[in-house]
Amino acid sequence: MDLSGCRDIISSLPEAISCHILSFLPTKEAASTSVLSKKWRYLFAFVPNLDLDESVYLNPENETEVSSSFMDFVDRVLALQGNSPLHKFSLKIGDGVEPDRIIPWINNVLERGVSDLDLHVYMETEFVFPSEMFLSKTLVRLKLMLYPLLEFEDVYLPKLKTLYIDSCYFEKYGIGLTKLLSGCPILEDLVLDDIPWCTWDFASVSVPTLKRLTFSTQVRDEFPKSVSIDTPNLVYLKFTDTVAGKYPKVNFDSLVEAHIDLRLLQGHQGYGENDMVGNATDFIMRICNVKTLYLSSNTLQVLTYSCDAIPIFNNLTHLTIESNPEVGWQSLPGLLKNSPNLETLIFQGLIHKATDKCGDVCLCKPREEIRSCLASSPVKVIKILKFGEISDDMEKQREQIKYFLETMPNLEKMILYYNTTSVEDVTEVSSRLQRLVSKLASSTCIVQLISDNLSLSSTVSTNGLLCF
């Protein structure tokens, strides 16, 4: 085929568009275009985003040579770009990269006014980020990962809105975190992942401008001594931690949505109240303004054993409960009674530990011994996720659903998300639901059975089976 008349459409594009296209390519591929012509070499010099990942170059047979090649490549890329403005710089490196090469790279992009800095630095030897990084006047987003030491004399990041710290260490522990946050006057989004503050004397997050906070640690055999969180404008919270010894100050005045996974100290799950370490009361009392709340099964356990009282959740309209075969529902009755405006109740599974202290929301005790708090519940919608996931307890799950339907007069809709690959199972459950129509506490309630695995849906109402 004669290609002599074909046009080079890419090369004929305006330089701004070509440069924009290059910014979406991995840096290794984008850099390779610089050998095509002088024009492409010029264009690459103005690519605003650099994504440099050592793993792209790794070869297990000769890691030393590959690491050296990667370091030389980064040097060439930065030299080629000169002093051109840079928007985003992402660097992912391992132990094979020399620390003395990393510092100049970071300083180079800081001097060029980078606004989005993403550093994944895994080193067996101690590595400290350059102090200039904590005095940047251009950084808007900063992400630091994988074991570096955060050491700084001064911090002032006047434009920083998003800060993500994962598996890093603070030289002065709680004092270091406090100093870092105090130097971020307009911070809005903070993620602290795998930060070992259980070993600190205290931990404090005090940021008046913060809107979103995510904290997570997987340490379960130690508990933090003291945790304070003063965030009056926070609207979203995702919090995973072991119950602290104390919570001197907690301010969630503006909180709208919270995902809480508080855990008892490992080994204390079956202890009595007098044996508990820590007390979650001051923390739980401060989340009472939320509209949407997710509670893990661990948190249900904390509410039972490590919380003096359950607050009134006047604003709560959506509540999600995670169930666990090893954890009871003792705290659930009080939680539902103290949620006077709850509209949607979601269960991630129904199987829980049988106990005579579950109150009146389940069938752990004989039916004749209980008066259901559900009879006065304002809940309009119940969603059951993972229904049928534990097939050995199907009868217990069906009885629990029946109990909900027969005792909740305000219920308008129940949706069951059935985890099954059997059409026969769906048909059987649908038939059982149909037989319950005359016993529903709510005359307007609709029950919908959905199986995504089978792309099937069955709906039952007081008028009978609507569709299948």
Swiss-Prot record:
Pfam families: F-box, LRR_At5g56370
Intervals holding LRR repeats: 114-136, 138-167, 169-194, 216-241, 292-323, 324-349
Coiled coil: none
Record keywords: Leucine-rich repeat, Repeat
InterPro entries membership: F-box-like_dom_sf, F-box_AtFBL13-like, F-box_dom, FBD, FBL60-like, LRR_dom_sf, LRR_FXL15/At3g58940/PEG3-like
Domain named F-box: residues: 7-60
Source domain of life: Eukaryota
Protein name as catalogued: F-box/LRR-repeat protein At4g14096
